[in-house]
C-alpha cells in the first residue's frame, strides 16, 4: 500500500499535466470536506447536499461525491439518475468529465462505486490514469464527500484524506453515543494524522440544545481521548426538511428562508472563515487516501 502511495506521489508530481495545473492556479486551493456519522438516519446526506448547494449559492464551484458506497442515496435527494460512476474511471472505461453530472441546483455530482477501494491495487499505469482524471477536480473550490455511516474501511479512507471532517449527530442518546464512538475510532485509527474533526448537531429544537449536546461530546472526547473537537453549528428540526426529501428537492432550494436553510448558511459561513492551512487540495487528498488500508 505504501509503495502505491509513493508511486502516486511521483506520478502526480512529475507529469506535465500536473505541472501545468500548478502553474495555472498556484494560489488555488480546493477545500475537501468529508461528512460522516456514527449511525444512519441522522440526516448526514441531507447535510452534505444542502451544504453543497449553500456553497454554490456563494458563487463557489462545488463537486459533491457520493461516498456512501453501500447505501448511496445522494442521487435520490437530487432527483437525478447517474448513468456512470467512479468505478468506470477506475476501470479506465470513462474519463472524469464523462461521469460528472451537472444538476439543476448549481452543483456537480459524482456517483460513488462499491469498488472505489480498488485503487489501492491498481498498476502504475492505472494509477497514472486515475490520478490524472481525479486531478481534473482541482478546478473546484469545494469538494464535499458524503461518506457512509459507521466505521467501514472506505469511510475511514475518506475521513483520513479530507481536509475537514464533520460528524453529524442528533439529540437522540443512541446518536450521541454513536457519534462519540465514531470519533473514538477516528482518533484511535488515525490519531497521528491530527484529523480536523467538527461536530454538527442536527434536528435540534433550540440553539441551547445544540450547544449542550456538542459540549457534552466535546468534553468527553477531551477527557477520555485527549483530542480536540470543535463545534461547527446546529440545524433546526423542521417539517420542511422531511417535506423536501419527499419532493426530492433540497430545502436550500425550495425553502431558502426556512430555519434549517438559515442554519446551513451560517455553518458554511463559519467554515469559510477557517483557514485551510497547508492543504494541497486534490493532490493531497489522493496521497492521503492511499495511505489508509
Sequence positions of predicted segments:
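Inter-motif core of Ras-like GTPase G domains
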Residues: 133-138, 152-174
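G-domain G4 guanine-recognition motif of GTPases
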Residues: 170-171, 197-211, 234-241, 256
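NTP-binding/hydrolysis catalytic cores, primarily Walker-type P-loop NTPases
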Residues: 248-293
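Walker A/P-loop NTP-binding active-site region of P-loop NTPases
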Residues: 32-96
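Extreme N-terminal, non-catalytic leader segments
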Residues: 1-38
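Conserved C-terminal guanine-recognition region of P-loop GTPase G domains, centered on the G4
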Residues: 131-134, 176-194
Amino acid at each position: 500500500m505504501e509503495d502505491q502511495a509513493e508511486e502516486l506521489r511521483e506520478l502526480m508530481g512529475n507529469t506535465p499535466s500536473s505541472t501545468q495545473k500548478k502553474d495555472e492556479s498556484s494560489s488555488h486551493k480546493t477545500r475537501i470536506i468529508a461528512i460522516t456519522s456514527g449511525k444512519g438516519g441522522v440526516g448526514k446526506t441531507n447535510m452534505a447536499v444542502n451544504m453543497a448547494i449553500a456553497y454554490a449559492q456563494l458563487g463557489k464551484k462545488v463537486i459533491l461525491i457520493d461516498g456512501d458506497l453501500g447505501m448511496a442515496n445522494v442521487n435520490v435527494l437530487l432527483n437525478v439518475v447517474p448513468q456512470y460512476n467512479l468505478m468506470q474511471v477506475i476501470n479506465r472505461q470513462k474519463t472524469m468529465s464523462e461521469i460528472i453530472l451537472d444538476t439543476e441546483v448549481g452543483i456537480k455530482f459524482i456517483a460513488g462505486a462499491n469498488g472505489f477501494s480498488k485503487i489501492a491495487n491498481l498498476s502504475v499505469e492505472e494509477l497514472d490514469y486515475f490520478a490524472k482524471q481525479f486531478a481534473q477536480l482541482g478546478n473546484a473550490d469545494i469538494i464535499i464527500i458524503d461518506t457512509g455511516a459507521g466505521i467501514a474501511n472506505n469511510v475511514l479512507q475518506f475521513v483520513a484524506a479530507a481536509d475537514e471532517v464533520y460528524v453529524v449527530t442528533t439529540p437522540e442518546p443512541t446518536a450521541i453515543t454513536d457519534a462519540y464512538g465514531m470519533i473514538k475510532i477516528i482518533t484511535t485509527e488515525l490519531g497521528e494524522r491530527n484529523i480536523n474533526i467538527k461536530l454538527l448537531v442536527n434536528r435540534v429544537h433550540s440553539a441551547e440544545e445544540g450547544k449542550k449536546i456538542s459540549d457534552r461530546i466535546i468534553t468527553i472526547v477531551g477527557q477520555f481521548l485527549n483530542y480536540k473537537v470543535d463545534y461547527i453549528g446546529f440545524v433546526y428540526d423542521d417539517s420542511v426538511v422531511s417535506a423536501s426529501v419527499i419532493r426530492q428537492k433540497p430545502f436550500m432550494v425550495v425553502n431558502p428562508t426556512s430555519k434549517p436553510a438559515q442554519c446551513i448558511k451560517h455553518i458554511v459561513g463559519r467554515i469559510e472563515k477557517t483557514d485551510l492551512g497547508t492543504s494541497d487540495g486534490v493532490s493531497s487528498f489522493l496521497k492521503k487516501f492511499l495511505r489508509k488500508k
